[in-house]
Swiss-Prot record:
This is DNA-directed RNA polymerase subunit beta. Its main location: plastid. It catalyses: RNA(n) + a ribonucleoside 5'-triphosphate = RNA(n+1) + diphosphate. Its EC number is 2.7.7.6. InterPro entries: DNA-dir_RNA_pol_bsu_ext_1_sf (IPR042107), DNA-dir_RNA_pol_su2 (IPR015712), DNA-dir_RNAP_su2_dom (IPR007120), DNA-dir_RNAP_su2_hyb_sf (IPR037033), RNA_pol_bsu_bac (IPR010243), RNA_pol_bsu_CS (IPR007121), RNA_pol_Rpb2_2 (IPR007642), RNA_pol_Rpb2_2_sf (IPR037034). Pfam families: RNA_pol_Rpb2_2, RNA_pol_Rpb2_3, RNA_pol_Rpb2_6, RNA_pol_Rpb2_7. It comes from the Eukaryota.
Length: 1072
C-alpha cells in the first residue's frame, strides 16, 4: 500500500541532540532541584540564618564568544546569580541580595564544552539501574540457591538469599549474614507487623529459635545484632546514638537510598504502590522482596536478566553536571557556615555577598572537566569523529565496570540493544563491548532509559503511528525486524506475507496480521559510523567494526571528494557536525571572502565568520571554503561554505581512486598497498597539518625571563626568522633547529665559574659577561613548515603562578608516502609499500593506469565482500557520471539483489562508453589488464573499479624514529622504550633467531652488547670512537645477566657463571 504525500515519513534526529537535550534538562530541572536542597544555615547561637531564595535564579549571557574563548584559552561559561537572604532573628530583619554563586560551563550547539580553550565532551555512562534483581546459582552440591540483590542509587548492594532449608538471610558483607527478620526490625518494624505484611509467615516463623526471637524483640536489640554482624564486633556492644549514626552512615545511606528511578523499579518489580517521593528502602520493600524470593524458590516468578537494557540506566551529562553542582553546594555550605561563625566571633556584620564565594562551584567544575574519566577531550580528527564521540556510551567510569573485571556476558550483544545500541560499533582491545555507540534514532528518556522509535500498527484502520518505546515496553510486542517488508504494494500481499519478528528477546517468523510494531528505517539499529558503510550486509561484523573505527581516523584532504557509492547519511552527518556554514535566514550575498560572508535579508546585514586554518587537537586542519558568489540569493538551510572533509554539504573523507585486486611482485603482501605516483604529484592524498608549539615566561627568583632576539649563545642563521621582539614572523618558512621564540633566563654566576676568556674581557675591556641562560623555543625534528599564526597570551598580573604564554602555529603540507596507512570503508586497511611511476603501473584496456593495487587474498579470508560490490558499482558510476545511495540489507526484497543492481549498471556503462571490457559476460566485474613495464597482458582477468579510499591519521612522519644516543633505564641499563623518550628498538627472542638464521654474528653481538646493556663495552666504544682505533670486543657479562644473578641471590640462590676464552677455550672462573 503506497502512501500519499509525506504520510508515514520521518526525519532522522540531530546527531548532537542527545547531548544538547541533556544539558537543557540540567539547566531547567537539575539546577532547581539542587538549589532547593540547600539548607538554611544558622550560627552556633542561632542568631543569624542564611538561606538561598532559589525561585528566581538567573544565568547571565557569556561575557566572551566561543571563538574568543578558544583563542585566549578561557572557559566559555555563564555566571549563576541566586537571591540570598540573611535573617536576624532578634530584630526579625531580613537583608536580601543577589549573590554570585560561580561560573557554569555552557554547552554549544554541537554538544561540546569549551574549558580553558579546549573542546571537551561528556560521555554517557551505562550503569546498573537501582532496584531489585533475582538470580540463581548452583552451589557445590548442585542445588540452586536463589538470591535477590538490592542495588541502591549510589551503587551499593545488599543481598537476600534463601538456602536449601528455606532459611532466608540478609547478607550484610561478603562473609557475614543475618536473619532476614533482623533487617526490618532494625528499620523499626516489630515481629507482629512483619508477619502481617508477608505472604508466607509460617516460613519466617520456622526459622527463629528463642535466642533469635530475643534479638528481634525490640528495635534496639535488632540494631545491636545488625551492627555486631556488619562491623564484625565481638563482645556485647551497648546501644547508643553514635552507634546508630555510624550504622546509618556506613550502611543505610550507601545501600538503602534507591532514588526515584530505584523507587519506580522497585514498585514495578514487587508490585507495590509506595509513593515516588519516598526514595529510601522501607521494611515493606524488604518484606515484599522476601515474598518474591520465596516464590522463586518454589517455582513462581521469573528470574531477571541483568544485561537487559530495561535493567540499565543512562547516566547522562545532565546527571553528571547535577551531581557536581550538588557537591559544589555542599562545599559552599561549609564555607558559609565557617564564615558566619568567624564573623560573629570577630563582631563583624556580614552580608549575603560577603558570605558567598564563587570558588567552590568554579573549582568543582574545573576539576570535573579536567579529571573525570567521562569528561574527554573532543576528538576533532574529521567531522564524523566529532559527532560520533558525543554519542558514545561507556560501561567504564566511577560506579561502573573496569576493562579487566568485566565478563564476556556483559560485553556481548543483547537482543534488547535492537534500535538502541549499535551491535557493530565498539572499541577494539581490552574495552571491546564496554564502549559502544548509540543507534542513530535512539533517544534518552527522563528516567535514564534508551528509547527507540517504532511504527505502531492499528488493528482497525491499519494506520501507523510513531512511538518511542523503552526496553521494558517493547518486550511484550511483536516487532517486525525488516522495515522494508512493509513496502508491499497492496493489502492482499500484505496479509499473505510472512515476516521475521522479535518477541520477548526471541526472533520468530510470523504472519503480517500479528505484527504490533515495525521498524521505521533499515539502518535504525546501527550507529552513524556503521550506517556510512555501503553493502554492510556483505561484510563480516569484525571488518565492519574496523571500518566504523577507521572512518573516524580519516584525515581531511586538501581536495576532498564525495563518494560515488554511499548510504544517504553523508549529508546529515556533515550538517550535524557543524563543519559547514549554513544559512540561518534567506537573503542575498553582498560580500564574500575567505574570512566572512555578508548576508542581507529582512533589512539586516548578517556577518557569518568562517574558519581559517584552525588546528584540531589531532593536528588536522579545519578550514571553510565559500561556496556562494556575490549577488546570489540563498535560502534558509543552504550551504554557504564547505568545511574540512565536506563537499557540497556532504561528508567527504577520502577519494575515489581506480584500484585493482591482484598481486604485484610481492609489494602487496600481507596488506601492503602499491600506489601510483599520480597520487603524490597530483595532490590526490595531500593533507595539511597544523602543529602548536608553546613556551611560557616565568618570573624567577633572579628576575623575569626575557623575550628577545639577541641570543649571544646561538648562531645568526638560527635567529633569521625572529622579529625585533624575539618572536618568529608570520609567513616564515622554518626548518628543524630554528628558533621560534628567543628567551633568556637570568641566573647567578660566581667569579670562579667564568671561562678564562670571559674574565679577560671583563678585566681588559670592561665588558659585562652575560649571566643569562638560553632557553629558546626551537623547532624539533620533523616540524618544518610555514608559520601561520602567533599568539601572545598576556594575562593580568603576570607572575610565577600566572605566566605569559606564546604559541606558534606551523602548517605542514604532507603528501602520501611510503609508510602511510590507507583504508577503505570495509575494514580493508594497508600500509603503502612502494610508489611506482605511473608508466609502470598496470593499465586498463583504454590505457588508464591503475592508482592502487590490493592483495586479492585480503577479501575471501576476511569475508568483507562489500568492497567488491562498491568497487564495481563505483566504476559504473564514474563512467556514467552518477552517484549511488544504497540502502543496506536489500536482500530482503529478493535474492542476489546487490548483484542485480551492480551488473546492469556495468552493462549500461559498457554500452554508453562503447567499452566492452567494462562488462564482459564471461567474467562480469573483471577485466584483462596489462603490465605497464612490458605491455604484456596478465594471465588472469582482474577485478578493477573505483573504491573510496581514506588516508588515516597514522602517518609515517609521526611514527618514524631512529636513536643514535639516548637515556638508559637505571635497573636494566637498557635503552628506554618509545619515540617520545628517544628510546631504542627492542631485539627480542624471535628477532635474535632471525639474525642467527642469517648468520650475522657481529651485528647480533653489537645489538646485544654495545647498543644495549654492556656498560663497559659502551664506555670503551665511546673512547675508541673519539681517539680512533680498533673497537675492542666486549668482555664480561652484560648488565641484564648480572641483574638476573642478583635477583636469584635475593631468593637465596647462588648462581656462578663462567666465561670461555677465545684463544684456548679454557674455562676461567670469574665472579659476576
Amino acid at each position: 500500500m503506497l502512501r500519499d504525500g509525506n504520510e508515514g515519513m520521518s526525519t532522522i534526529p540531530g546527531f548532537s541532540q542527545i547531548q544538547f537535550e541533556g544539558f537543557c534538562r540540567f539547566v531547567d530541572q537539575g539546577l532547581a532541584e539542587e538549589l532547593h536542597k540547600f539548607p538554611k544555615i544558622e550560627d552556633t547561637d542561632q542568631e543569624i540564618e542564611f538561606q538561598l531564595l532559589v525561585e528566581t535564579y538567573q544565568l547571565a549571557e557569556p561575557l566572551i564568544k566561543e571563538r574568543d574563548a578558544v583563542y585566549e584559552s578561557l572557559t566559555h561559561s555563564s555566571e549563576l546569580y541566586v537571591p540570598a537572604g540573611l535573617i536576624w532573628k532578634v530584630g526579625r530583619d531580613m537583608q536580601e541580595q543577589t549573590v554570585f554563586i560561580g561560573n557554569i560551563p555552557l554547552m554549544n550547539s554541537l554538544g561540546t564544552f569549551i574549558v580553558n580553550g579546549i573542546y571537551r565532551i561528556v560521555i554517557n555512562q551505562i550503569l546498573q539501574s537501582p532496584g531489585i534483581y533475582y538470580s540463581s546459582e548452583l552451589d557445590h552440591n548442585g542445588i540452586s540457591v536463589y538470591t535477590g540483590t538490592i542495588i541502591s542509587d549510589r551503587g551499593g548492594r545488599s543481598e537476600l538469599e534463601i538456602d536449601r532449608k528455606a532459611r532466608i538471610w540478609a547478607r550484610v558483607s561478603r562473609k557475614q549474614k543475618i536473619s532476614i527478620l533482623v533487617l526490618p526490625s532494625a528499620m523499626g518494624s516489630n515481629l507482629r507487623e512483619i508477619l502481617d505484611n508477608v505472604c508466607y509467615p509460617e516460613i519466617l516463623l520456622y526459622f527463629p529459635n528463642e535466642k533469635e526471637k530475643k534479638k528481634i524483640g525490640s528495635k534496639e536489640n535488632a540494631i545491636l545484632e545488625f551492627y555486631q554482624q556488619f562491623s564484625c564486633v565481638g563482645g556485647d556492644p551497648v546501644f547508643s546514638e553514635s552507634l546508630c549514626k555510624e550504622l546509618q552512615k556506613r550502611f543505610f545511606q550507601q545501600r538503602c537510598e534507591l532514588g526515584r528511578i530505584g523507587r519506580q523499579n522497585m514498585n514495578q518489580r514487587l508490585n507495590i504502590d509506595i509513593p515516588q517521593n519516598n526514595t529510601f528502602l522501607l521494611p515493606r520493600d524488604v518484606l515484599a522482596a522476601t515474598d518474591h524470593l520465596i516464590g522463586m524458590k518454589f517455582g513462581m516468578g521469573t528470574l531477571d536478566d541483568m544485561n537487559h537494557l530495561k535493567n540499565k540506566r543512562i547516566r547522562s551529562v545532565a546527571d553528571l553536571l547535577q551531581d557536581q553542582f550538588g557537591l559544589a553546594l555542599v562545599r559552599l555550605e561549609n564555607v558559609v557556615r565557617g564564615t558566619i561563625c568567624g564573623a560573629i566571633r570577630h563582631k563583624f556584620i556580614p552580608t549575603p555577598q560577603n558570605l558567598v564565594t564563587s570558588t567552590p562551584l568554579t573549582t568543582t567544575y574545573e576539576s570535573f572537566f579536567g579529571l573525570h574519566p567521562l569528561s574527554q577531550v573532543l576528538d576533532r580528527t574529521n567531522p564524523l569523529t566529532q559527532i560520533v564521540h558525543g554519542r558514545k556510551s561507556s560501561y567504564l567510569g566511577p560506579g561502573g565496570l573496569t576493562g579487566r573485571t568485566a565478563s564476556f556476558r556483559i560485553r556481548d550483544i543483547h537482543p534488547s540493544h535492537y534500535g538502541r545500541i549499535c551491535p557493530i560499533d565498539t572499541s577494539e582491545g581490552i574495552n571491546v563491548g564496554l564502549i559502544g555507540s548509540l543507534a542513530i534514532h535512539a533517544r534518552i528518556g527522563d528516567w535514564g532509559s534508551i528509547r527507540s522509535p517504532f511504527y505502531e500498527i492499528s488493528e482497525r484502520s491499519k494506520e501507523e503511528q510513531m512511538v518511542y518505546l523503552s526496553p521494558r515496553r517493547d518486550e511484550y510486542y511483536m516487532v517486525m525486524v525488516a522495515a522494508g517488508n512493509s513496502l508491499a504494494l497492496n493489502q492482499d500481499i500484505q496479509d499473505e506475507q510472512v515476516v521475521p519478528a522479535r518477541y520477548r528477546q526471541e526472533f520468530v517468523t510470523i504472519a503480517w496480521e500479528h505484527i504490533d510494531l515495525r521498524s521505521i528505517y533499515p539502518l535504525q539499529y546501527f550507529s552513524i559510523g556503521a550506517s556510512l558503510i555501503p553493502f554492510i550486509e556483505h561484510n563480516d561484523a569484525n571488518r565492519a567494526l574496523m571500518s566504523s573505527n577507521m572512518q573516524r581516523q580519516a584525515v581531511p584532504l586538501s581536495r576532498s571528494e564525495k563518494c560515488i557509492v554511499g548510504t544517504g547519511l553523508e549529508r546529515q552527518a556533515a550538517l550535524d557536525s557543524g563543519g559547514s556554514a549554513i544559512a540561518q535566514h534567506e537573503g542575498k550575498v553582498i560580500y564574500t571572502d575567505t574570512e566572512k560572508i555578508l548576508l542581507s535579508g529582512n533589512g539586516d546585514t548578517i556577518s557569518i565568520p568562517l574558519l581559517m586554518y584552525q588546528r584540531s587537537n589531532k593536528n588536522t586542519c579545519m578550514h571553510q571554503k565559500p561556496q556562494v558568489h556575490r549577488d546570489k540569493y540563498v535560502k534558509k538551510g543552504q550551504v554557504l561554505a564547505d568545511g574540512a572533509a565536506t563537499v557540497g554539504g556532504e561528508l567527504a573523507l577520502g577519494k575515489n581512486v581506480l584500484v585493482a585486486h591482484m598481486p604485484w611482485e610481492g609489494y602487496n603482501f600481507e596488506d601492503a598497498v602499491l600506489i601510483s605516483e599520480r597520487l603524490v604529484y597530483g595532490d590526490i592524498y595531500t593533507s595539511f597539518h597544523i602543529r602548536k608549539y608553546e613556551i611560557q615566561t616565568h618570573v624567577t627568583s633572579h628576575g623575569p625571563e626575557k623575550i628577545t632576539n639577541e641570543i649571544p649563545h646561538l648562531e645568526a642563521h638560527l635567529l633569521r626568522n625572529l622579529d625585533r621582539n624575539g618572536i618568529v614572523m608570520l609567513g616564515s618558512w622554518v626548518e628543524t633547529g630554528d628558533v621560534l621564540v628567543g628567551k633568556l633566563t637570568p641566573q647567578t654566576a660566581k667569579e670562579s665559574s667564568y671561562a678564562p676568556e670571559d674574565r679577560l674581557l671583563r678585566v681588559i675591556l670592561g665588558i659585562q659577561v652575560s649571566t643569562a641562560k638560553e632557553t629558546c623555543l626551537k623547532l624539533p625534528i620533523g616540524g618544518r613548515g610555514r608559520v601561520i599564526d602567533v599568539r601572545w597570551i598576556q594575562k593580568k598580573g603576570a607572575s610565577s603562578y600566572n605566566p605569559e604564554k606564546i604559541r606558534v602555529y606551523i602548517s605542514q603540507k604532507r603528501e602520501i608516502k611510503v609508510g602511510d596507512k590507507v583504508a577503505g570503508r570495509h575494514g580493508n586497511k594497508g600500509i603503502i609499500s612502494k610508489i611506482l611511476p605511473r608508466q609502470d603501473m598496470p593499465y586498463l584496456q583504454d590505457g588508464t593506469p591503475v592508482d592502487m593495487v590490493f592483495n586479492p587474498l585480503g577479501v575471501p579470508s576476511r569475508m568483507n565482500v562489500g568492497q567488491i560490490f562498491e568497487c564495481s558499482l563505483g566504476l559504473a558510476g564514474d563512467l556514467l557520471d552518477r552517484h549511488y545511495r544504497i540502502t543496506p540489507f536489500d536482500e530482503r526484497y529478493e535474492q542476489e539483489a546487490s548483484r542485480k543492481l551492480v551488473f546492469p549498471e556495468l552493462y549500461e556503462a559498457s554500452k554508453r562508453t562503447a567499452n566492452p571490457w567494462v562488462f564482459e559476460p564471461e567474467y562480469p566485474g573483471k577485466s584483462r589488464i596489462f603490465d605497464g613495464r612490458t605491455g604484456d597482458p596478465f594471465e588472469q582477468p582482474v577485478i578493477i573499479g573505483k573504491s573510496y579510499m581514506l588516508k588515516l591519521i597514522h602517518q609515517v612522519d609521526d611514527k618514524i624514529h631512529g636513536r643514535s644516543s639516548g637515556h638508559y633505564a637505571l635497573v636494566t641499563q637498557q635503552p628506554l622504550r618509545g619515540r617520545a623518550k628517544q628510546g631504542g628498538q627492542r631485539v627480542g627472542e624471535m628477532e635474535v633467531w632471525a639474525l642467527e638464521g642469517f648468520g650475522v654474528a657481529h651485528i647480533l653481538q653489537e645489538m646485544l652488547t654495545y647498543k644495549s646493556d654492556h656498560i663497559r663495552a659502551r664506555q670503551e666504544l665511546l673512547g675508541t670512537t673519539i681517539v680512533g682505533g680498533t673497537i675492542p670486543k666486549p668482555e664480561g657479562a652484560p648488565e641484564s645477566f648480572r641483574l638476573l644473578v642478583r635477583e636469584l641471590r635475593s631468593l637465596a640462590l647462588e648462581l656462578k657463571h663462567f666465561l670461555v676464552s677465545e684463544k684456548n677455550f679454557q674455562i676461567n672462573r670469574k665472579e659476576a
